[in-house]
């Protein structure tokens, strides 16, 4: 889980809206679930960058037909999107483009689309903010690497000292780099996926929802999240877990729990603890549960492997 931590170091530079809890400014990637090295700085919606992950989808990144017949087919990338010619495939996820090269199978884009549509369902204001910020999701082929994604192709130059292609199989969207990425092998739950057990897309897209959507729709969100996080830490919760890293990873790990796409560890192992489901989150950290409940549907849908 070392990738994510680096991400928030990159997050120190962002362009999302400032509020009373954090300043603006910046361009780099944000932390994501599944990392473990030492952190340099914390990332946030107000700091905005790309959240990085080395987590995987044990329960998968797809599952459940999206509403209204969305995510039914893959097409060419509309020219009006103005995207890099690297992208050849496209699916519309309620206004959020899901794109890839020719490499990934169509099934990977369709399952990513399904997850995005379901996660965005309840809050149209957040979705509209994300659309206005040109948020998109890029699906890497199993044979592709992070720097193949055009929005992330400069990471080695912008943030030297990290081997992004080795360490990251997913990054979250920020105003400077508005693509969230995920990987074919994780989305489709291949046996070869080294990160089975978690869902990169759920974790990373939850960062994008916060950074590219909620922070614009609700300018006080960062402060509220910070207060909830600080209260949990002061109460001794999330000790020896990745959720304790900063408010952004606290949020993303909580969203994974909400969708039952996290890993359980008893005792805590520095990354996870015994909390990995919505019901357990409600009992363990009610303020975080209730904050998340404002943005995601409290229904029976969960991502699932094909």
Question: Predicted regions: what is each one?
Answer:
Residues 6-7, 281:
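Short secondary-structure subsegments characteristic of cysteine-rich extracellular domains
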């Amino acid at each position: 889980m070392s990738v994510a931590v680096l991400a928030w170091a990159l997050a120190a530079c962002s362009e999302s809206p400032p509020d009373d809890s954090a300043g603006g400014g910046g361009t780099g990637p944000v932390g994501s679930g599944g990392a473990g090295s030492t952190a340099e700085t914390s990332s946030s919606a107000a700091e905005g960058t790309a959240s990085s992950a080395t987590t995987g989808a044990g329960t998968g990144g797809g599952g459940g037909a999206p509403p209204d017949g969305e995510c039914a087919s893959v097409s060419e990338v509309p020219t009006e999107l103005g995207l890099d010619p690297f992208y050849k495939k496209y699916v519309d996820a309620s206004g959020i483009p899901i794109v890839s090269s020719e490499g990934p199978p169509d099934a990977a884009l369709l399952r990513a689309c399904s997850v995005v549509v379901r996660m965005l369902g309840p809050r149209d204001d957040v979705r509209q903010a994300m659309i206005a910020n040109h948020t998109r999701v890029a699906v890497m082929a199993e044979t592709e690497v992070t720097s193949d994604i055009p929005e992330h192709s400069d990471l080695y130059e912008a943030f030297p000292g990290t081997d992004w292609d080795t360490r990251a199989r997913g990054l979250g969207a920020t105003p400077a780099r508005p693509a969230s990425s995920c990987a074919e092998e994780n989305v489709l739950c291949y046996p070869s996926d080294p990160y089975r057990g978690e869902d990169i897309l759920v974790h990373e897209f939850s960062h994008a929802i916060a950074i590219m959507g909620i922070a614009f729709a609700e300018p006080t969100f960062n402060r509220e999240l910070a207060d909830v996080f600080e209260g949990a830490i002061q109460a001794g919760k999330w000790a020896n877990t990745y959720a304790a890293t900063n408010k952004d990873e606290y949020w993303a790990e909580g969203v994974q729990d909400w969708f039952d796409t996290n890993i359980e560890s008893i005792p805590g192992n520095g990354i996870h603890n015994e909390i990995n489901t919505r019901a357990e989150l409600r009992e363990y950290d009610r303020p975080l549960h209730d904050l998340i409940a404002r943005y995601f549907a409290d229904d029976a849908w969960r991502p699932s492997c094909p």
